[in-house]
């Protein structure tokens, strides 16, 4: 790609793809594809994160209304995902582009090897001119192992592939200083450089009845992209030419701009911070916090006050102070059993004192993030 060409993740929610009756609207699908095709014709790489599997499938199972129970939703998604990707593929092919399908579960991201494998696959597809279409594998995913919604998934995918821009298309114009559905004179916020508690409180939870992601989930998604050094945009899906304008910086909506002075998290730290899932805790002496946070030092055995849980070498653990306040997350070089042996045996601890328990390169401090760990 040239300097003017960008790698863009486009996320579209169910509410932006469905009719008033809750079914997939072929007209809305066609308009979305036409906008993505324009980006492709301009030389951009585009990855689409698309909801809509349940909406595409539930009528085929004989349901009059969108189902409420998990088995019914998963059955609807099983039928709908095939129909949705078929519709996308035909539309893109009519413009000369090939689409691919990638169904992801949270466990694909929590395992580092699979996480890296997903990235490699996506990079090959994008470099070969393919349009990957991503969705969570709703048919096999249970609630406790879900991303939560496709807003979160799209943000993590954007970081995974080093995207230049994440564009979330919805049924609202952007972020307002109050909920526009409840406050008629609410003003559109054009640019956000920090997502503060005040912004979150004023946003409320404006969302649609069709999708699962309200404004809170979108703000959480943009916290992830901002920590990863990626620009974000939130705008209305039915605005003509909005994807092109979003790249040009002229679209009506809200831009989320990462801090140019802060260091963006690399892939390793993104995985640790947003995907890994801690398996235990290491409690450090309070006087060690300065070395870990301010002086950015690795964590050594002499700093350990206590160890909670059972974990193996290579696991991700939480680093806590003596009051239980979380300092960050890190990958440990030693198992919990080995660390406990060192704690009991002063001679062994002394012999191991030069070996880092958590290397600085494998540690993410909460101060590095604009999103809670």
Curated annotation (Swiss-Prot):
<feature type="binding site">
    <location>
        <begin position="212"/>
        <end position="218"/>
    </location>
    <ligand>
        <name>ATP</name>
    </ligand>
</feature>
<dbReference type="InterPro" id="IPR011529">
    <property type="entry name" value="Glu_5kinase"/>
</dbReference>
<keyword id="KW-0418">Kinase</keyword>
<keyword id="KW-0067">ATP-binding</keyword>
<keyword id="KW-0028">Amino-acid biosynthesis</keyword>
<dbReference type="GO" id="GO:0004349">
    <property type="term" value="F:glutamate 5-kinase activity"/>
</dbReference>
<dbReference type="InterPro" id="IPR001057">
    <property type="entry name" value="Glu/AcGlu_kinase"/>
</dbReference>
<comment type="pathway">
    <text>Amino-acid biosynthesis; L-proline biosynthesis; L-glutamate 5-semialdehyde from L-glutamate: step 1/2.</text>
</comment>
<dbReference type="GO" id="GO:0003723">
    <property type="term" value="F:RNA binding"/>
</dbReference>
<dbReference type="Pfam" id="PF01472">
    <property type="entry name" value="PUA"/>
</dbReference>
<dbReference type="GO" id="GO:0055129">
    <property type="term" value="P:L-proline biosynthetic process"/>
</dbReference>
<dbReference type="InterPro" id="IPR001048">
    <property type="entry name" value="Asp/Glu/Uridylate_kinase"/>
</dbReference>
<feature type="binding site">
    <location>
        <position position="11"/>
    </location>
    <ligand>
        <name>ATP</name>
    </ligand>
</feature>
<keyword id="KW-0963">Cytoplasm</keyword>
<comment type="function">
    <text>Catalyzes the transfer of a phosphate group to glutamate to form L-glutamate 5-phosphate.</text>
</comment>
<feature type="binding site">
    <location>
        <begin position="170"/>
        <end position="171"/>
    </location>
    <ligand>
        <name>ATP</name>
    </ligand>
</feature>
<feature type="domain" description="PUA">
    <location>
        <begin position="279"/>
        <end position="355"/>
    </location>
</feature>
<dbReference type="InterPro" id="IPR036393">
    <property type="entry name" value="AceGlu_kinase-like_sf"/>
</dbReference>
<keyword id="KW-0808">Transferase</keyword>
<protein>
    <recommendedName>
        <fullName>Glutamate 5-kinase 2</fullName>
        <ecNumber>2.7.2.11</ecNumber>
    </recommendedName>
</protein>
<dbReference type="GO" id="GO:0005524">
    <property type="term" value="F:ATP binding"/>
</dbReference>
<keyword id="KW-0547">Nucleotide-binding</keyword>
<dbReference type="Pfam" id="PF00696">
    <property type="entry name" value="AA_kinase"/>
</dbReference>
<comment type="similarity">
    <text>Belongs to the glutamate 5-kinase family.</text>
</comment>
<dbReference type="InterPro" id="IPR041739">
    <property type="entry name" value="G5K_ProB"/>
</dbReference>
<feature type="binding site">
    <location>
        <position position="138"/>
    </location>
    <ligand>
        <name>substrate</name>
    </ligand>
</feature>
<feature type="binding site">
    <location>
        <position position="51"/>
    </location>
    <ligand>
        <name>substrate</name>
    </ligand>
</feature>
<dbReference type="InterPro" id="IPR015947">
    <property type="entry name" value="PUA-like_sf"/>
</dbReference>
<dbReference type="InterPro" id="IPR002478">
    <property type="entry name" value="PUA"/>
</dbReference>
<feature type="binding site">
    <location>
        <position position="150"/>
    </location>
    <ligand>
        <name>substrate</name>
    </ligand>
</feature>
<dbReference type="GO" id="GO:0005829">
    <property type="term" value="C:cytosol"/>
</dbReference>
<keyword id="KW-0641">Proline biosynthesis</keyword>
<dbReference type="InterPro" id="IPR005715">
    <property type="entry name" value="Glu_5kinase/COase_Synthase"/>
</dbReference>
<dbReference type="InterPro" id="IPR036974">
    <property type="entry name" value="PUA_sf"/>
</dbReference>
């Amino acid at each position: 790609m040239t300097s003017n060409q960008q790698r863009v993740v486009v996320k579209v929610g169910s509410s932006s793809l469905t009719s008033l009756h809750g079914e997939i609207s072929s007209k809305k699908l066609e308009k979305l594809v036409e906008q993505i095709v324009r980006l492709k014709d301009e030389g951009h790489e585009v990855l689409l994160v698309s909801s809509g599997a349940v909406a595409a499938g539930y009528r085929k199972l004989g349901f009059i209304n969108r189902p409420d129970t998990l088995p019914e939703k998963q059955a609807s998604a099983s039928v709908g995902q095939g129909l949705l990707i078929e519709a996308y593929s035909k539309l893109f092919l009519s413009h000369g582009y090939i689409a691919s399908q990638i169904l992801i579960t949270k466990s694909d991201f929590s395992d580092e090897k699979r996480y890296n494998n997903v990235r490699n696959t996506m990079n090959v597809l994008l470099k070969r001119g393919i349009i990957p279409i991503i969705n969570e594998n709703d048919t096999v995913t249970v609630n406790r192992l879900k991303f939560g919604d496709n807003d979160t998934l799209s943000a993590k995918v954007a970081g995974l592939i080093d995207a230049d821009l994440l564009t979330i298309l919805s049924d609202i114009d952007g972020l307002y200083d109050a909920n526009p559905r409840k406050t008629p004179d609410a003003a559109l916020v054009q640019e956000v450089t920090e997502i503060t508690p005040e912004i979150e409180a004023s946003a409320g939870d404006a969302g649609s009845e069709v999708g699962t992601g309200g404004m809170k989930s979108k703000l959480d998604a943009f916290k992830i992209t901002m920590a990863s050094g990626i620009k974000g945009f939130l705008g209305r899906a039915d605005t003509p030419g909005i994807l092109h304008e979003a790249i040009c910086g002229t679209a009506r909506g809200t831009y989320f701009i990462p801090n140019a002075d802060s260091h963006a998290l690399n892939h390793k730290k993104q995985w640790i911070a947003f995907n890994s899932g801690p398996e235990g805790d290491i409690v450090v002496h309070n006087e060690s916090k300065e070395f870990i946070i301010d002086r950015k030092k690795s964590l050594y055995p002499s700093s350990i006050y206590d160890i909670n849980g059972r974990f193996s070498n290579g696991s991700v653990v939480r680093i806590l102070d003596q009051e239980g306040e979380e300092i960050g997350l890190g990958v440990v070089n030693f198992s919990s059993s080995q660390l406990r042996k060192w704690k009991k045996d002063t001679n062994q601890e002394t012999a191991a004192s030069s070996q880092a328990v958590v290397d600085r390169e494998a540690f993410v401090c909460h101060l590095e993030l604009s999103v809670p760990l």
